[in-house]
Amino acid sequence: KCNPKGFTNEGCRGIDKKHWNSQCRTSQSYVRALTMDSRKKIG
């Protein structure tokens, strides 16, 4: 199953295991950056 966000609650799943970690870390970092930015704007 594919996840639009590129990661799931259980972990990150990519097409290839070699890119699995890199895609996971990039996605999480990107989401965290947006979350922090949103909190700063709202708060």
UniProtKB/Swiss-Prot annotation:
Q: One GO cellular component term, please give it.
A: synaptic vesicle
One GO MF term attached to the UniProt entry: growth factor activity
- Quick one: signal sequence residues? none
Q: Where in the cell is it found?
A: Secreted
| UniProtKB keywords | Growth factor, Secreted
Entry keyword 4Fe-4S? no
* UniProt record, GO biological process: cell surface receptor protein tyrosine kinase signaling pathway; modulation of chemical synaptic transmission; negative regulation of neuron apoptotic process; nerve development; nerve growth factor signaling pathway; neuron projection morphogenesis
Q: Name one Pfam family in it.
A: NGF
- SMART domains, sorted: NGF
Q: Which domain of life is it from?
A: Eukaryota
Got any disulfides in this one, which pairs?
none
- Describe the family membership recorded for this protein in Swiss-Prot or TrEMBL: Belongs to the NGF-beta family.
Summarizing the function annotation, the protein's role is: Promotes the survival of neuronal populations that are all located either in the central nervous system or directly connected to it.
Please name the PANTHER family in this protein's record. Answer: BRAIN-DERIVED NEUROTROPHIC FACTOR, NERVE GROWTH FACTOR NGF -RELATED
Q: What is this protein called?
A: Neurotrophic factor BDNF
